[in-house]
């Protein structure tokens, strides 16, 4: 199957596992035009590739095959020789012509690299087509090179598909590119002097990670398409190819592609039940808190809205739909302790899932918070509720007391209710019966709840690529400063555990369906619609919260790539141009809250 693919050619660096071959192919960049030297190099190539042929049996080169190029091991000597000839032919043209060629001309996909190079040589230099096997005509190597750079040579590039390669060249152009280079007297030779690095604009064929990255993304999308079309045989072949392409990448791209490959494999081969308990999930959550500003931003912006809503109240009650390790509340307690006129009585209701070992983790968190409250002089009361789903909560269980100001807080919790129809509506009805002064919601800014698998996969790929990029960028700065605020782990350990934390989400979004797919993130626009339908009104997060959130990011290592954006009274945190999480605040209309 042929496809159009734009490439830039002029020299080549092609690597495989044979170091001798790699060094030889790299020599195509500096070509000696002395006859004896050319003969010796060609003989060396012949011997090297003859041995390669005997070793590999003339099969396809595995590394180049993984990158999409079909080159038999027995043909690689010819490919190397022809790439040298191709560079010399194209080098005789004007620099402007080559630039024009690389940018305005469409070259067809050179998956069959041997035939493609031969075709290019034929089109650029018809005389070279008469030499089918360079290794069989060793005596004419010098003649070939000399003819290639004949001052009177003219090559018609109009045969290449696309626009004319370059305007008619002036005479004696090639002669201007030749000069004598002083060598030891024993080996006099006339060679082409390589131009200075800053002036070398000739395109070079490289097996680089950028091209492989494009192939990787296309293969990921093709695999998702095959799964949606239930072509599991094709999907299985593609997912194996994804793993190979991912191994050729570095940094965030390699990591995120590997997690998506694992998720696709789970969907193809089945989903063995995961046995990771909630305590381990909370450990991953804490490492994610340390390695990035996302949870810090979520806690800060929600606390600011709650603090403003509690202004003047003598008794306050916070209901946290996902207490976890209680990391959000020390900052709020300290802010309440500094309130003019003295701190209010602070009551906290924490909700969490059951533990695998049946330990009372919520009470342990409550005890630590009680110790802090005693230290800073805040009257504190804690109660924990263990439940499998916040949809199971009943308003009477929460024991709302007369005269206390109530706030409901949900950070990355409500989207899990979307797996069961009607659960979100039930939770919001419960909240309305509680009659809080404010409801704070933090959710991922992504749409991973659509009905079409490919659309969901595409959105997730873009979203988590940005998240992994931000982790990579911020933690490189953290490693340089070698700082860690809590002592939970080194920056590298926090990064690794955070990647596992996000990898679990990727797996759930891609591999699971039905009630098992709980990572059903929706956008701020979608949550606005849901909250409005449930009878809530938006609360504008003030400019003070925006300024303080921006200051928080400025203090965070690697914060240059993060940005805070105000969106119709809500605050969003993103990485460069992509918004990733959103904080919103809500209240009931005045006539309902009375």
Swiss-Prot record:
Motif (VHIID): 316-320
Tagged with keyword Transcription regulation: yes
InterPro entries cross-referenced by the UniProt entry: DELLA_N_sf, TF_DELLA_N, TF_GRAS
Motif (DELLA motif): 61-65
Region (Leucine repeat I (LRI)): 214-268
PROSITE patterns: GRAS
Complexes and interactors: May be a homodimer.
Name under which the protein is recorded: DELLA protein 1
Annotated organism of origin: Medicago truncatula (Barrel medic)
Gene: DELLA1
């Amino acid at each position: 199957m042929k496809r159009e693919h734009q490439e830039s050619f002029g020299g080549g660096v092609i690597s495989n596992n044979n170091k001798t071959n790699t060094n030889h192919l790299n020599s195509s960049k500096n070509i000696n035009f002395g006859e004896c030297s050319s003969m010796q190099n060609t003989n060396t190539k012949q011997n090297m590739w003859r041995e390669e042929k005997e070793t590999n049996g003339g099969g396809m080169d595995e590394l180049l095959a993984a990158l999409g190029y079909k080159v038999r091991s027995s043909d690689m000597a010819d490919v190397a020789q022809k790439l040298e000839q191709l560079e010399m032919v194209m080098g005789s043209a004007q620099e402007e012509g080559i630039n024009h060629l690389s940018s305005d001309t469409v070259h067809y996909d050179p998956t069959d690299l041997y035939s493609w190079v031969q075709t290019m040589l034929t089109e650029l230099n018809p005389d070279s087509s008469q030499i089918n096997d360079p290794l069989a005509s060793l005596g004419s190597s010098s003649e070939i090179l000399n003819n290639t750079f004949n001052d009177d040579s003219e090559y018609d590039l109009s045969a290449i598909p696309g626009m004319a390669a370059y305007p008619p060249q002036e005479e004696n152009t090639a002669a201007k590119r030749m000069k004598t280079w002083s060598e030891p007297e024993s080996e006099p030779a006339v060679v082409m002097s390589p131009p200075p690095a800053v002036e070398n604009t000739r395109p070079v064929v490289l097996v680089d990670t950028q091209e492989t990255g494009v192939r990787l993304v296309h293969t990921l999308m093709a695999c998702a398409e095959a799964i949606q079309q239930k072509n599991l045989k094709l999907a299985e072949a593609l997912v194996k190819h994804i793993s190979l392409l991912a191994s050729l990448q570095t940094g965030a791209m390699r990591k995120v592609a590997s997690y998506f490959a694992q998720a696709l494999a789970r969907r193809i081969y089945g989903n063995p039940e995961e046995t990771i308990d909630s305590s381990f999930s909370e450990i991953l959550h804490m490492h994610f808190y340390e390695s990035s500003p996302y949870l810090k931003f979520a806690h800060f912006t929600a606390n600011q809205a709650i603090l403003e809503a509690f202004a003047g109240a003598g008794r306050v009650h916070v209901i946290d739909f996902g207490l976890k390790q209680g990391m959000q509340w020390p900052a709020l307690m300290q802010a309440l302790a500094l309130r003019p006129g003295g701190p209010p009585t602070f009551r906290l209701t924490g909700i969490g899932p059951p533990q695998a070992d049946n330990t009372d983790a919520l009470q342990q968190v409550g005890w630590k918070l009680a110790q802090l409250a005693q230290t800073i002089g805040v009257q504190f009361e804690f109660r924990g509720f263990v439940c499998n789903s916040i949809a199971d909560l009943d308003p009477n269980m929460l024991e709302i007391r007369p005269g206390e100001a109530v706030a409901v807080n949900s950070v990355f919790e409500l989207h899990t209710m979307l797996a069961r129809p009607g659960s979100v509506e039930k939770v919001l009805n419960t909240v309305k019966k509680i009659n809080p002064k404010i409801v704070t919601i933090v959710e991922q800014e992504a749409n991973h709840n659509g009905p079409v698998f490919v659309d969901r996969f595409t959105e997730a790929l873009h979203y988590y690529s940005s998240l992994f990029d931000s982790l990579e960028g911020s933690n490189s700065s953290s490693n340089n400063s070698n700082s860690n605020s809590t002592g939970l782990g080194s920056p590298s350990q926090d990064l690794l555990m955070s990647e596992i934390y996000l990898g679990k989400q990727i797996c759930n979004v891609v591999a699971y369906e039905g009630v098992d797919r709980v990572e059903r993130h929706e956008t701020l626009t979608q949550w606005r619609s849901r909250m409005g339908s449930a009878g809530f009104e938006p609360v504008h997060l003030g400019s003070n919260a925006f300024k303080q959130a921006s200051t928080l990011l400025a203090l965070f290592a690697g914060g240059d790539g993060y940005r805070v954006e105000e969106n119709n009274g809500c605050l969003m945190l993103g990485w460069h141009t992509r918004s990733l999480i959103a904080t919103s605040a809500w209240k009931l209309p005045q006539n309902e809250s009375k």
